[in-house]
Amino acid sequence: MTSKIEKVSEFIFQSHKSGDAFSNLEKDMKPQDFDEAYEIQKRLRQKLPRGPLGGYKIALSSKIQQDYHKITQPVYGGLFKKEIFHSPKTIVLKDYHRMSVEFELAFELSDRITDSTINRNPKNIFSDISNVMPAIELVDDRGANYEGLDPLSLACDNAWSGGLVLGDPICDWKEKDFLNIQSTCEWNQEPKLTTNVLDAKPFENLCWLINELHSCQNELKAGMIIITGSVFKVRQAKTGDKINHILSDHGNVSIEVI
């Protein structure tokens, strides 16, 4: 471990402890590339008092986001095991610096995930999946200004991982045609939003992430949960919000914010 990795991870850790707003890393604090950023992230996760890993998440998953930020790949972060909840879940807003939500598919990993010799692709990825579930991701962006966001700084800060709420697994998911599954957002009494669940390219993103995690020798084991990008735009939550994510007639996940 280099002194820079220790220095930057400690800086971010202290920022979390003191409740400071997120800001881009600058000058000698900014990582050279994603490899260095993820080493900083690993060290930060070791410092944070949030327990062992329970999985991983993706940020900046769409091509539009990547083009805007001048990158060619998503950004990933770790999900902490004790921050993976089951629906219905009451979320206490004051426990977060600034909490937003995203609407995702969640994948529970199978025993095959430990095999690092396989290059994952959409034709073979099903063997790495034991369950598929609707999910609501909790994003804690620490009050960040999204204009001018530096993806390397986001990677260092664990991609703003704030937790996850899961619905029940989809029954016989391997037999489903996901082209026919709609993802619906219900937010209080507002008009519903609906789109195809595959719009966020969940299976393609899952392949990319598993390959990336193995290449960087990250921890991967059966039972971990991976989420791979939101089908709707991220939105800030407020006290009193009641939010549902419904997958056609294949299940739902709900939170209430207090």
What are these regions (language model features)?
Residues N205-V234:
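A conserved acidic, glycine/proline-rich C-terminal tail/linker
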